[in-house]
Amino acid sequence: PDGSFVRARKGSSTIRVDFHGVPAHAGNHPEDGRNAIDAMAAAIPQLKHLASEIDGTAISTGLVSGGTTANTVAEHASVTFDLRYGSDGDRDELIFRMRKLCLTGFADGVTSDLKIESLGPALPLSAESASLITLINRAAATLRLPSPVWAEAGGASDGNELASFGVAVIDALAPSGGLLHNPNKEYLDLATVEPRLRLIEKALELLAAAKTGASPAR
């Protein structure tokens, strides 16, 4: 919402942990059961705490499910996490620690296993991307537009995938807006449409001129 341009993005992965307990009648023989939901409740804060051990990482609890009926000791439970990280190495280390903790277990008689539902790359600032930043700054100066403000974003984009192939990527050059993922309040700042289009056009001219050796249009 502040109109910043993006030079780096955190990666995003989705991890599910399944818990397997033993069902029993909650009234007659609760001692015969092993509650998967209770194990999940104990596991969530322990797993999320792992992010505090690796700078720049975050774990968000997104989905939970479990049980069959209120009077049955829950045999199954599941929690799905969203992971964020600044490098693929941090991602791999975080998942390794989560898996290790799951193998240790969270409650007697309940097993847990970790599954990777999606695995996304981070988008760190590269030397190739830095050259594009210089070009965008030059385009803004040529048009006498405000100097771009560059930031690191927590949200991932398709640019993350492109960057993983060694492509130079910068992001968020489109018109600005805010309140993402809010179906009733997400908005586009119309005042940013024309300046951003001019900036992109000028940047493409400068990029083409750099490739061909021709002078950019004025």
Predicted feature descriptions by range:
Residues P1-R9, S13-R218:
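Metal-dependent amide/peptide-bond hydrolase catalytic core
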